[in-house]
Amino acid sequence: MVQYNLNEFLPYLRRHGRTRLDKKAGALFFNWSDSGFTVRFSGTTLRAKVNSIGARDFMDPNKIEYANIGVVAQDGQSLVSRVECRAEEEWYTIWQAEQPGEYTVRVVKLSENARGKTGLVALETDGALLE
């Protein structure tokens, strides 16, 4: 697996929505609903290391809410997975294919900004990121 940090993966991403580059945290944050990124890669697997910062629930201050992200398939229409990001820094499998190939996936934040912050720290693939 080849790992790409913030400075290495940025040239390969197409950002959409409100994103914020935080070099001190080493992450690209996409905190608003439907913001995120699109990336092309070769191989079978794409994993993302996500920094998730929980937020207190408005109705129950003892409850911490976490952001949900979704992965949209190559057709741009189908939501193929939904993940609740519950750890400060955690690896998530974004795409897993049976056969090696070239794939394009879009990752979006599904939850509201008030449900926590979400930052992309690193990407990892068994192939390579593509322009």
Residues covered by each model-derived region:
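N-terminal secretory targeting modules
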Residues: 1-131
